[in-house]
Amino acid sequence: INPDVSFLEQIESFLKETEKLGRSGLMHHWVMIRPWDNALLGLIGFDHVTRTIQAEWNLGYWVRSSAQQHGLARKSINSTLEWLGAINEVIVELKVDPLNTAGLKTVLQTVSNWNGERSISGDSAVTVAGVRTLHHCHLIKTGPKMS
């Protein structure tokens, strides 16, 4: 989010881009909703913004702070990886800020469960809340027989 641009304008732009690229199969996003009150808990999605030669997709997610530490990210990641790999074998990048303890734990657990690996060549700087940090890259192979 850019603090110098209207929040609503940025959200509208994101939704338009997500819808357009989603319809063409270039991006897939889902919301995480609490079923009993329809509260928005997070987002998860794939796009083609990758840093490695091997990966076809990049997986990103966000879980609101009040919904963290309940396994929601892990369950959502596993579900989307299974969905993406239901037909073909696919390599997916996951990036994580190594200083984000909870995110790092989630990604490392996912990489371990899916027999993934660290990919230093895919490390890249990411700006979050105005702070630029080097995010570590991990690769996971998913496919019909992987999940």
Each language-model region and where it sits:
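Conserved GNAT-fold acetyl-CoA-binding loop/helix
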Residues: 1-17
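Alpha-helical interaction segments
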Residues: 4, 20, 51-52
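Short linear sequence motifs
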Residues: 7, 23, 130-131
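Acyl-donor (CoA/ACP) binding surface of acyl/acetyltransferases
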Residues: 29-147
